[in-house]
Amino acid sequence: MVFLKRFRAYGFKSYADEITIDFTHSMTGIVGPNGSGKSNVVDALKWVLGERSMKHLRSKSGDDMIFFGSKDKPASKLAEIELTFDNSNRLLHDSRKEISVMRRVYRGSGQSEYFINSNPATLKEISGIFADIGLEKGSLGIISQGSVSWFVEAKPEERRKIFEDASGIGRYTKRKEEVVNQLNRTLINLKQVSVVLNELKKDLKKLTLQAEKAQQFIRVKNELKELELAVLVGEYLQAQTELDKFNFQINSSEHDFKIHEPQLELLEEQIVIFNSRFHSADMQSNELQKELQDIYQKINELEQRKVIIDVQLRQGFSQKDEKQKAAALKKLILVDQTQLDGFENQLSNSKTTITDLEKLINEQKSLVDQIKLQIEKNTADLIYQRSLKTIIELQTNELKKTNNANILVKNANALTGILNTLGTFLKFDKQYEKAILKALGKSIGYLVVNNNNAAIQAIDFLVKNEIGKVTFLPLDDVASDTKITNEHMEILKQLDGFLGVCSDHVKCDPLFQPVVNTLLAQVIIAKDLNSAINLSNYTYKLYRIVTLDGETVYAGGIINGGFEKTNLSDGYLSSASLDNEQNINKLENNERELKKELTELEVKLDEMNRKLKYEELLQAKFIERIVQIKKIILELKMEYEQLTNTTFDGKKAVASEAELIHSLNSAWAKRDEINSKLKLNQELKLQLAKTIKQSEEKIVDLRALLDEQRAKLVSAREGKIRFENTIQNITEKINSVYKMTMEFAIANHNKPVKLSSMQAHNKIAKLQNQLNEMGVINMESIAEISEKQKRFDDINAEYESAQQAVENLQKAITEIDEIASNEFDQLIQKLNQELPKTFKYLFGGGSCQIRYTDPSNVLVSGIDVFANPPGKNIANLMLLSGGEKTLVALSVLFSILKVSAFPLVILDEAESALDPANVERFANIIKTASKNTQFLIITHRQGTMMKCDMLLGAAMQTKGVTKTFAVELENAEKYVSENDSN
């Protein structure tokens, strides 16, 4: 049979170049001159199977295993041997049909690498596979001249190893060693457990006394807790009721303020308008008075002229009088012309003033319209912001019902290291809002804490109060070195649609930057979904990518998108609420400023309109006066012409008088009209004065009412603060002392107290004193006694289990000993049947027998070999010659191969001490045994070579470098002769 199929070597000793030897026959001879490296095959086999002794490997150090170099070949950096075995008959302890084992070592390292079928392995695994096949140290599977000497000279106990390999009980021996080791460990453990049990009994007795005291402490403390919590909850609810009353009073007063303050502002604005109107009416009265004076002046002039005409009519004019009259008329015409020029200049100025006023009025109206539009827009924005405020309050209230993180923040005074939800610390531009919120997801509501201890404490608080679960971000334990590789960043920067990394667009305090980096430093922002897909492909789908619209491409290529209702976090709502409140305040301030500006503009506009009306009245008066003067001048000119060109005409004088009377009638009518207007205007002024007085009285009343409401509001707010402090103190005490929320306390401890308030507080003080008098309490004793008892029970069970294990292991050892003893003894009996036959064949007679040194203890007994060559009676093997010693060892080996064949035997010049006749017997018996065993024989003897199926030659064509080649048998004599001559 062929067990070793292939031998491959590289860099091992003299094998500088890689060589491969395929074994196809069961009896192969390896021949060659001394020093050619043929025995390196044996060293290689030992080395692969784990031989560590440098002496047995014919070396001084591990580096001696590696080719040292020659004149033509450099030194190798490593040595490598690989052996391939046929395991189709399952001779090895492995199920694979072919087993390849390899060992490799590097120069200078001293560390070996082992492989089984190219897979990394350990020496222990290799040794386990090759157990009981005769290739281990001390076995007859590898025999050299040194092995023969060892076999003969070895102590009986050392020689036993050979027979154990042959019997196959090595596996039992190893199993027994394992069981014995396990038994020893179990016995040690049993002793240790016994010591622990005794200590636990003492501890249990001590803890029992401590636990009884602790339980009494707990009973008193629980009574104190129940009573104090009931009192605190009752006081809290009472304070809450009073607080609600004050809040109602505050809301009512503020509501009244909202009603009365606008009324006061309206009245004050109305007074301004009424005063403006009164001033306008007063100015109009002055203008009418002036106009009335002008009418009276005109009437006087007309009456004077009438007197003149009347005189003319009664007396007539003489020529002398006419000349004097003409001169007087001429002078009068010049005076009237001067007066006319003055009125025309005033008229021109009045027209200019009216034009300027109309322009200013139009500009003022435009400003008023703009202000009104701004007020309308501001009002619309204010309505929107107030609606948004309502929505935010509703969302905030809804979120607070389930936001456990908020509860922890609210109760931060009862805990340590609680900061706030992550969202409250982050700021980012509106452009990236959807992307960053999508990237953060639920983590925006995670609770930031200082360290792991704070998180653990908060979790205990949540569990105790049955609140729910919260995810924590401990600042001292987050990994902040996560980032996109530089290589990928360079690629991303060159691609369209890349807008950066999320963490770069978030602003926060440096304290929270590690948290931001952990969550966002590997999340990319893309312009749109197409860009995101492209970026993902270029980065091998290693990163998560979010778009500006909130779509996501996950690592691995999964895409998420579509409409999504925003899930606002508490932090985000708080920020939005703050912005909303600021916007409302700003808009309300704007509204007040705009209304104030509008009132001022309207007052100015009224003033301008009054000025315009006044100028228009003046203009009308100037026009009317100009017409009158022109008419007088015309009449005077006509009269002058009559005086200078004609004599006195009585008829014309009469006509002039009639015309004067008509003018007087018109003037008197105008006088009456102005007097009527003055009367109406006076009545208007009286009415306005009355209205102003009534409004001022109402303002006084409203201010008094507001002062009264303000005083009530101050009192209510003081009461509110007082009860808020009471509520806060109670809440803080319940949080800090009892580690529970107020809501939980109300839900579980709102119970009636049968004692009065004073009695309840006295009992609380008494219970507290009772607790203080108990001294030091080991509260953990209750839990410890339970744990100790459990541990005692567990260890006692372990002790009993160990006792049972000891019995089982002892039983297993007995069974292993029986099986191993039987199998070993059967081998010895079979050997004693075969050994005499083999011995007689090799020696040509004589006797040989194997005996126990201690027959009563087969498992540990040494093995003696008693050999008597023909004609000799030898008491000690050391007395045999070298050839006889070799034959004895070979007799035992070949007998073992007949009884329990080894799959592979290596003989390294084992027959060198034999004479030719014995060499021939040696070769014949190997040939017979090769049917069941593969032999590798390193030999110089021709008799051995002739029986081999195949010969492998080893030679050094280059000094220091071994080459191998197949040698035909007809050439074997040539090599042998050359070797013998050497």
Curated annotation (Swiss-Prot):
GO terms for molecular function: ATP binding; ATP hydrolysis activity; DNA binding. It is found in: Cytoplasm. InterPro entries: P-loop_NTPase (IPR027417), RecF/RecN/SMC_N (IPR003395), SMC (IPR024704), SMC_hinge (IPR010935), SMC_hinge_sf (IPR036277), SMC_prok (IPR011890). One of its GO terms (cellular component) is chromosome. One of its GO terms (biological process) is DNA replication. Residues 416-535 form the SMC hinge domain. It holds the Pfam family SMC_N. ATP binds at P33, N34, G35, S36, G37, K38, S39, N40. Keywords: ATP-binding, Coiled coil, Cytoplasm, DNA-binding, Nucleotide-binding. Gene3D superfamilies: 1.20.1060.20, 3.30.70.1620, P-loop containing nucleotide triphosphate hydrolases. Residues 171-231, 280-310, 337-377, 575-718, 753-822 form a coiled coil. SMART domains: SMC_hinge (SM00968). Belongs to the SMC family. Contains large globular domains required for ATP hydrolysis at each terminus and a third globular domain forming a flexible SMC hinge near the middle of the molecule. These domains are separated by coiled-coil structures. Required for chromosome condensation and partitioning. Homodimer. This is Chromosome partition protein Smc. It comes from Mycoplasma genitalium (strain ATCC 33530 / DSM 19775 / NCTC 10195 / G37) (Mycoplasmoides genitalium).
